[in-house]
Amino acid sequence: MPELPEVETTRRGIAPHLEGQRVSRVIVRDGRLRWPVPEDLDIRLSGQRIVQVSRRAKYLLIQAEVGTLISHLGMSGNLRLVEAGLAALKHEHVDIELESGLALRYTDPRRFGAMLWSHDPHNHELLIRLGPEPLTDLFDGERLYERSRGKSIAVKPFIMDNAVVVGVGNIYATEALFAAGIDPRREARGISRARYLKLAIEIKRILAYAIERGGTTLRDFIGGDGKPGYFQQELFAYGRGGQPCKVCGTTLREIKLGQRASVYCPKCQR
């Protein structure tokens, strides 16, 4: 699943080609996504100039002169730029054609993504309850500590809760907990303020670095400029269950935690 760095990489890849451009038409080949693509999307968006491409959590917001397209990549979706009129392959569901001759093409084999229309995106039901962005001053270790009081759930699903902080998905939660030396199974309420301060620093560092490197290359992710990300080869824990820890050599353990695979080092993480 594309996580925050992948979505931000996509935003940075497509924004320069979209902002300031006028939409010539929208082609919806198959609108059966997680929520149906609006049947009148072509009417709503065609002829409008794209003002800004921004991101909130893992949602891309393509703001037009009137209204905003909210896009989510789901489990396997991607947005990339192609020449307008290029023949579509299977799973290439939507094209937003621009007067420049390019088209923003949405591909989603599993159909878990979304393309929705809103005149007030930040108050949309999918966005209004989201927590702070992790790379802003609104998120820090103090917030983690305060929100964790009384929480008996494990720390890993706690930091993956979008009401606590957005965009810390399975990959980056695993890596941040490894870097902070925290066992992902520990109860959130049992972790000290000092350790949460360290964890917040690592979340920010790892996400920022992943964005700089272009996200994490997994099976289905392609950046908005058509290039893959490069962070995967630098993972310390995620996907490395049964392999030696890169720090101490201890065999990494893989467990199920909150319905997700979680890998940790029994020596480095306490």
Curated annotation (Swiss-Prot):
Keyword Zinc-finger among record annotations: yes
Location of the active site: 2 (schiff-base intermediate with dna), 3 (proton donor), 58 (proton donor), 260 (proton donor)
GO molecular function, one term: 8-oxo-7,8-dihydroguanine DNA N-glycosylase activity
CDD domains cross-referenced by the UniProt entry: EcFpg-like_N (cd08966)
Keyword DNA damage: yes
Binding partners and assembly: Monomer.
Protein name listed in UniProt: Formamidopyrimidine-DNA glycosylase
Source species taxonomy: Bacteria, Pseudomonadati, Pseudomonadota, Gammaproteobacteria, Pseudomonadales
